[in-house]
Amino acid sequence: MSQSEIIRPQSLGLPRSVLATFLNEDVEAVIAAGTRDPHRRALAQHLAQGHGGADGLDETLQMVRDTFRRFAGEHREAAHGWHLADDLIPLDVIQNLADLGVFGLTIPESHGGAGMGKAAMCVVSEELSRGYIGLGSLGTRSEIAAELILNGGTEAQKAHWLPRIATGEILPTAVFTEPNTGSDLGSLSTRAVRRGDQYLVTGNKTWITHAARADLMTLLVRTNPDQPGYKGLSMLLAEKPRGTEGDPFPATGMTGGEIAVLGYRGMKEYELGFDGFAVDANNLLGGIEGMGFKHLMATFESARIQTAARAVGVAQSALDLGLGYALDRQQFGQPILAFPRIYGKVAMMAAEIMMARQLCYAAAHQKDSGKRCDLEAGMAKLLAARIAWSAADNAVQIHGGNGYAMEYPISRVLVDARILNVFEGAAEIQANVIATRLLEQG
């Protein structure tokens, strides 16, 4: 996005004869009234005074935002320490989030949740991720698990699992990806064979977030090897004992190893191995085999909206850090925010973040209205992820050499931002979804 400097053709000294090939009166009028250096300077000054623009939230969502903004702010400094030490987020912090209702935010009240919409999910995810992406991502696994069970579970499964997920008693994790299966889930090979009243699972999974601490795995497996592609896949609600630091994977038939990562720490990433791992047959999601991919697809819209919100939070964190540093850092007798190349970056970061935030809200409102929103969700995720990376890169540039030092939180925000273009649907997949839907619409 705004990683490149903005230069208009006339600023390069091109003659009007050249400009005339692509300019007309309407375009010239827009340029004349559009963004210029004084506008960028004024916007940066407004930001420095704490004015970030109206977000359009109603009173309830403003209260939700303020609550989680305070919570994230209280843990921001500690979070950088967790990142540097590659520590798990403390369990007492997770319990505090549970007490605030994060894990049951969108679960219906009839199943023990708060019954709020995806717009509330966006607000909470953004504010927590603004403090630390790990905090904003703790709710992702609960959101995915609850969405799977709500959309595809039996009434007994809903009654058994949803209230426990909502309270944080149960910490779920999504177990989908395999070493040779990223976006192409149709080639998934982990097998689940029915033996009496159990399924025995054999295979390998990778990039599983928070796996050691999880109590419940939404486990995508192949139950029918004779059916090609997606048709033979099923989703299991696989229980396991919660691991400890000394024994992260105590379950029989299951092993795991940590994957060292640049950023997105706090929950840790794991490779998992299954060798006859037993799952109660009653925990087949929906009670019908072969529905796994359909179940999973039903979660894509919500998951991508929530990831877009996390990206907006990371981008806002980058802006906070970049602006704060630009105000504090003195060069040539004045704060570096006074220099055009700096306030220009800050102004464009703010404008782009607002754009991503509003697209995220629009997708959430579309979802809350019960309408199809894979196009909007894909757009929100694609745009917000790119803006988060751009904002982090620009904020590092504002910090200069200090931005490359690990003691400065912007170094963490940079590596956290990078994953957003990769997970929950890579940027290339999002672009393909968007293009396909646009072609369908004609």
Name each model feature, range by range.
Residues G168-F176, L220:
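A short, Trp-centered hydrophobic/proline-enriched beta-strand micro-motif
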Residues Q198, T202-T252:
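A short core secondary-structure module
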Residues M1-R130, L135, G152-G153, R164-G168, ...:
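Alpha-helical interface subdomain recognition
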Residues D275-K294:
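Long, acidic (Asp/Glu-rich), low-complexity accessory segments flanking structured domains
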Residues N180-S183, W207-H210, P225-Q227, V261-K268:
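Short Gly/Pro-enriched turn/cap motifs at secondary-structure boundaries
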